[in-house]
């Protein structure tokens, strides 16, 4: 190998509160028009996800590329917020959509590009099996 680029990092810019999600993204229009996330699966690369009553039955798969844990967790909150925007029962854009969550950012919202690349590679290699 003649050249290898240095590792780069990603960092989240701000924090958002989950209770504001429905109105900040106009999700009420989704419900008004009868849309849902039924039969939809979404891959989320973020800080992880907490189990939450609004996400009951939505979290189909969790993989931790930061700490190697096997159970769902989110030590920052951003990933859970994103998952809520996507598929939460009362506030999501695609309520009930299946979530395949890949933790690539740490408690500070920072992550190595290589972790994101590993997650994307895993998704590509397993998309048919995971149905995403």
For the regions a protein language model found, what residue spans apply to each?
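Protease zymogen maturation seam
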Residues: 1-41, 53-54
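Predominant activation on well-ordered alpha-helical scaffold segments within soluble catalytic domains
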Residues: 83, 117-124
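Short acidic, glycine-rich surface-loop motifs adjacent to enzyme active sites
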Residues: 5-9, 121-132
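Subtilisin-like serine protease catalytic core
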Residues: 29-43, 49-61, 69-114, 130-131
